[in-house]
């Protein structure tokens, strides 16, 4: 039996917060700040956004490893934060996250239309998130009331290693019955999510304006003067350089055009691993 390269995409694997729901990715960010505050440790929104895309325990561990935050923790507790301390913060983070998730559950403008167009092109819709399953259960239910249902969902604690490891993306490949990772496109607003797709051998699309990197509401984004938006886009594109996305677009609304371009490249024999 011979290997035949895929001729078209078979699936889009979409992130959740900052990609399909929660423009600006506010739900997780604010809760990190609140969870640390309950332990008397100040963390800014900007600091909290840094590791976004990772599983939430890993995110907290990464924050605790930042020297400035570690020193604030030491000032309160007289020691650097251990893994047990990270777990204590995580266990406070979780109920706060579940309680507040509905406040940031709106579907991103243009997402439903874009996803419908992808389905019309024959793509299945997989999804994964840095949220654990207990949070994703609520996120998925809220999204369904707003008209979005993915064909498959993988939470960060349903695989051995979350992002930037490729396990969640590959779990979607298996569940959706996709026969070649090169027939998948991973879409995300964070560098760990893009690395996840790259490591899984997929096409990757980074979102520059709807998620964590820009960190604005939809209304704030639309109100940005053109020159300021261009500066922000340049900054964000530089931030993504290390993860090497194949495409950078502002929001998921532009995704159908990217899919058509990828299909044309596949038809020419191009593969994601070679670009």
Swiss-Prot record:
Q: Name one GO biological process term.
A: DNA repair
Please name the catalytic residues of this protein. 15 (nucleophile), 56 (schiff-base intermediate with substrate)
Catalytically driven reaction(s): phosphonoacetaldehyde + H2O = acetaldehyde + phosphate + H(+)
Q: Which cofactor does it need?
A: Mg(2+)
The record's listing under SUPFAM superfamilies reads:
HAD-like
Q: What is its EC number?
A: 3.11.1.1
Question: Where, by residue number, does Mg(2+) bind?
Answer: 15, 17, 189
> One GO CC term of this entry?
cytosol
Query: Which CDD domains did the record assign?
Result: HAD_PHN
Name the Gene3D superfamilies for this protein: HAD superfamily/HAD-like, Putative phosphatase, domain 2
Superkingdom as given in the UniProt entry:
Bacteria
Q: Which InterPro entries match?
A: HAD-like_hydrolase_sf, HAD-like_sf, HAD-SF_hydro_IA, HAD_sf, PGP-like_dom2, Phosphonoacetald_hydro
Q: How is the cofactor bound?
A: Binds 1 Mg(2+) ion per subunit.
Q: What class of enzyme is it?
A: hydrolase
Keyword annotations of the record: Hydrolase, Magnesium, Metal-binding, Schiff base
Gene Ontology terms for molecular function: magnesium ion binding; phosphoglycolate phosphatase activity; phosphonoacetaldehyde hydrolase activity
Q: How does it assemble?
A: Homodimer.
Q: Which PANTHER family match?
A: PHOSPHOGLYCOLATE PHOSPHATASE, PHOSPHONOACETALDEHYDE HYDROLASE
The text of the family note is: Belongs to the HAD-like hydrolase superfamily. PhnX family.
Q: Which NCBIfam families match?
A: HAD-SF-IA-v3, phosphonatase
> What's the stated role of this polypeptide?
Involved in phosphonate degradation.
**Which protein is depicted?**
Phosphonoacetaldehyde hydrolase
Question: Native species of this protein?
Answer: Pseudomonas aeruginosa (strain LESB58)
At the highest ranks, the source species' classification is: Bacteria, Pseudomonadati, Pseudomonadota, Gammaproteobacteria, Pseudomonadales
């Amino acid at each position: 039996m011979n290997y035949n390269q895929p001729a078209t995409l078979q699936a889009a694997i979409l992130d959740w917060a900052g990609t399909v729901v929660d423009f600006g990715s506010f739900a997780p960010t604010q809760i990190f700040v609140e969870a640390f505050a309950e332990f008397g440790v100040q963390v800014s929104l900007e600091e909290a956004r840094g590791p976004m895309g990772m599983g939430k325990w890993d995110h907290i561990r990464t924050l605790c490893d930042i020297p400035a935050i570690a020193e604030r923790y030491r000032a309160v507790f007289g020691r650097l934060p251990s893994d047990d301390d990270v777990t204590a913060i995580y266990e406070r983070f979780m109920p706060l996250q579940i309680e507040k998730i509905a406040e940031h559950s709106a579907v991103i403008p243009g997402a439903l239309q874009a996803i419908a167009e992808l389905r019309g092109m024959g793509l299945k819709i997989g999804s994964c998130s840095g949220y654990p399953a207990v949070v994703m259960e609520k996120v998925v239910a809220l999204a369904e009331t707003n008209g979005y249902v993915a064909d498959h969902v993988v939470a960060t604690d349903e695989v051995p290693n979350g992002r930037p490891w490729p396990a969640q993306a590959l779990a979607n490949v298996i569940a959706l019955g996709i026969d070649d990772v090169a027939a998948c496109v991973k879409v995300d607003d964070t560098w760990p999510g893009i690395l996840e797709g790259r490591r899984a051998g997929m096409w990757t699309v980074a979102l520059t304006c709807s998620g964590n990197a820009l960190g604005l509401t939809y209304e704030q984004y639309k109100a940005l003067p053109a020159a300021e938006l261009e500066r922000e886009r340049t900054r964000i594109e530089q931030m993504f350089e290390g993860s090497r996305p194949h495409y950078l677009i502002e929001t998921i609304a532009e995704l159908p055009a990217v899919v058509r371009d990828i299909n044309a490249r596949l038809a020419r024999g191009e593969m994601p691993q070679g670009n």
